Amino acid sequence: GGILMTKQELLDFLKFNSNKPRYYTVHLNKKVLEQFAIGYYQDLSANRFIVYEVTERQQLHEKASFEREKDAIEELYEIVKFRCRIKSIPIQLDVSEIDAIGTSDKDLELLLIDGNLWLPDTEEEHLLRLQEKLNNYIYFLESKQYVERYGDNFDKKVIHITFQYSPSDNGLALLAAAQKTLQNTDMSLKVELP
């Protein structure tokens, strides 16, 4: 609860787990009457989003209905997770590691790679780990731990974050806050989204 899932996050989640054997199909905002389909569709007459599953005999069962599409997406996510017996994927982000360091002309660039999915049930941990890793990058620059190897003749120090999956709203808020913190320093944040 509390954190809402986007359609894109659900699609990413399904894609990420597409190697898992699935005897059913998942449909977003579409009513499909084939065996073992699960999904949600918009019932325009009732102005609601209906989450459904289709039985072996191709009967449509309404599981729940919501006013907001976001709630239908969340419900569908829970059903898919239960069906797939998918455990939440642990966040993999080594906070003590600088992923890569590079120099160009007058810039020093630290690369931070985040290949984790953004999902409601792991978002909190994801944000904490990302924040901690970012803090470590900033500390690395502030305490000039790069000098011995790269010297100290840089105009700009850039923390370049690459995301494999689009961050949630809270993820984007964290980045905006970090950018603000670095405003009057010789450090900056470069964010690369998929």
Task: Give the ranges of each region predicted by the language model.
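Negatively charged, low-complexity tracts enriched in Asp/Glu with abundant Ser/Thr
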Residues: 2-32
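Short aromatic-glycine-(Arg/Gly/Cys) micro-motifs in beta-strand/loop hairpins
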Residues: 30-61, 79-81
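Acidic, aromatic-enriched beta-alpha/helix-loop junctions
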Residues: 59-61, 124-147
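A short, charged, amphipathic alpha-helix used as a generic interaction element across diverse proteins
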Residues: 67-82
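Intrinsically disordered, low-complexity charged/polar segments
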Residues: 82-88
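N-terminal, charge-rich interaction modules
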Residues: 89-115
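Short glycine-rich, basic-tinged beta-strand/loop micro-motifs
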Residues: 108-118, 152-165
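Helix-rich interaction surfaces within compact, conserved domain-sized segments
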Residues: 160-194
